[in-house]
């Protein structure tokens, strides 16, 4: 299908870009949906629909690639994903979808910092500078008088940490397994955890009417932002590096802000836009630093290098 490794990696990275588009678009969609349905109820229904689709796509042949370790890997990855969505969706109740998009994108700074202790790859100078730049942006984005962090912002910040763990986990635990089957295990795990949490913590009162906006939210988030997105991540992220993948994911908050302004008519102050720009700049600096360093030393960069 691909003439060489570079074109294979390029195609994989284009697929990951499409993932960020669908994720960014769902921020305003989910924000409206959780006004009609409790958070965990919305999550488990979304994930259950996506799991049904993925299970059908994987088929018997796909599940045959999963051994005991494969199932355990999928459950672990699914648990990390569930925690990220839980913190993000609760955070959306208390902050703007644009803020949530930018803050979720901070996972790209966590990745190189966590890669040191978890994958024995210490953080580079660029990652440390990126953290400083992004943290400055965080202060501007969430600035109030007097300055405080919105509780919703803190929840989404926790979400970004678990997203980073999931990115690192995909790099380590997915090789050798059918992407659709392994993604099914992840999403099914999320559906089960969400259902249990909803039954325990949420007195669900189902809407008397299911408006088109809620039905559309389920279909869009289940099919495009869950089934397709995590299949694409599981299938294609291993064809690039965690660092390059994390850099691509910096597009998510940009899409989130664009769709939030377009669909919800949200308005960000110039200070907030500047903060969001600094966050994205910090993300890009952290991930582009190795490439810039190799070029300045006259070494031809290898796309597959960290």
What residues fall within each predicted segment?
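Hydrophobic/small/kink-forming positions within alpha-helical transmembrane segments
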Residues: 21-24, 28, 55, 78, ...
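Hydrophobic transmembrane alpha-helices of multi-pass small-molecule transport proteins
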Residues: 54, 75, 123-143, 159-163, ...
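Specific transmembrane alpha-helical segments of multi-pass solute transporters/efflux pumps
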Residues: 22, 26-27, 55-104, 140, ...
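Glycine-/small-residue-enriched transmembrane alpha-helix faces in small-molecule transporters
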Residues: 1-41, 79, 87, 145-172, ...
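C-terminal-most transmembrane helix of multi-pass membrane proteins
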Residues: 2-5, 47, 214-216, 250-306
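C-terminal transmembrane-helix exit sites in multi-pass transporters
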Residues: 53-62, 107-129, 254-274
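Helix-helix packing/entry segments at the starts of transmembrane helices
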Residues: 43-45, 86, 100-106, 170-192, ...
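Hydrophobic alpha-helical transmembrane segments of multi-pass integral membrane proteins
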Residues: 10-15, 41-56, 76, 126-133, ...
């Amino acid at each position: 299908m691909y003439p060489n490794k570079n074109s294979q990696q390029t195609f994989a990275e284009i697929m990951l870009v499409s993932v960020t588009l669908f994720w960014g678009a769902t921020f305003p969609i989910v924000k409206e949906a959780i006004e009609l349905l409790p958070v965990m109820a919305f999550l488990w229904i979304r994930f259950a629909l996506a799991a049904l689709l993925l299970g059908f796509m994987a088929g018997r042949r796909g599940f045959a690639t999963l051994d005991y370790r494969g199932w355990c890997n999928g459950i672990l990855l699914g648990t990390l994903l569930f925690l990220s969505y839980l913190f993000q969706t609760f955070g959306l109740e208390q902050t703007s979808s644009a803020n949530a998009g930018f803050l979720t994108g901070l996972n790209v700074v966590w990745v190189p910092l966590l890669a040191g202790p978890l994958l024995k790859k210490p953080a580079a100078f660029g990652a440390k500078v990126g953290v400083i730049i992004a943290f400055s942006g965080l202060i501007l984005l969430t600035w109030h008088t007097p300055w405080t962090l919105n509780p919703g912002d803190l929840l989404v910040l926790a979400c970004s940490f678990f997203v980073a763990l999931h990115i690192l986990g995909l790099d380590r635990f997915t090789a050798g397994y059918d992407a659709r089957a392994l993604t099914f295990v992840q999403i099914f795990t999320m559906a089960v955890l969400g259902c249990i949490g909803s039954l325990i913590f949420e007195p669900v009162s189902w809407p008397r009417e299911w408006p088109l906006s809620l039905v559309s939210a389920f279909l869009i988030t289940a099919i495009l932002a869950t089934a397709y997105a995590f299949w694409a991540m599981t299938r294609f992220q291993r064809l690039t590096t965690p660092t390059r993948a994390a850099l691509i994911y910096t597009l998510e908050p940009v899409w989130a802000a664009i769709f939030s302004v377009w669909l919800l008519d949200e308005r960000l102050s110039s200070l907030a836009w500047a903060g969001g720009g600094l966050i994205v700049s910090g993300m890009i600096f952290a991930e582009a630093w190795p490439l810039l360093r190799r070029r300045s030393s006259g070494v031809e960069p290898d796309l597959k290098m960290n």
